């Protein structure tokens, strides 16, 4: 009877598998914040402040858009003011002619 020695041959990877990561993404900047400075002259319809929510409230001659953007309703001078103790507002005062 012929007896054979069988070798236990195991093959392993010669390179490690390329793993995956759940990080490595970032969102685009939204360009929020003041678009007009205090004391600046703006025309009607100009965007004054882009925001999420109401960081700053609309004052005189200022409207609020659907995305909470504040815009000038008339041509005039921009003023950032305090509204009470802990709130801020932006107003536009027409230039006297």
Swiss-Prot record:
The keyword Ribonucleoprotein applies. It comes from the Bacteria. Gene3D superfamilies: 2.40.50.100. Residues 14-37 are annotated as: Disordered. Residues 1-12 form a propeptide. GO terms for biological process: translation. GO terms for cellular component: cytosolic large ribosomal subunit. PROSITE patterns: RIBOSOMAL_L27. The N-terminus is cleaved by ribosomal processing cysteine protease Prp. Keywords: Ribonucleoprotein, Ribosomal protein. GO terms for molecular function: structural constituent of ribosome. Coiled coil: none annotated. The keyword Ribonucleoprotein applies. Belongs to the bacterial ribosomal protein bL27 family. NCBIfam families: L27 (TIGR00062). HAMAP family: Ribosomal_bL27. This is Large ribosomal subunit protein bL27. It comes from Streptococcus agalactiae serotype III (strain NEM316). The gene is rpmA.
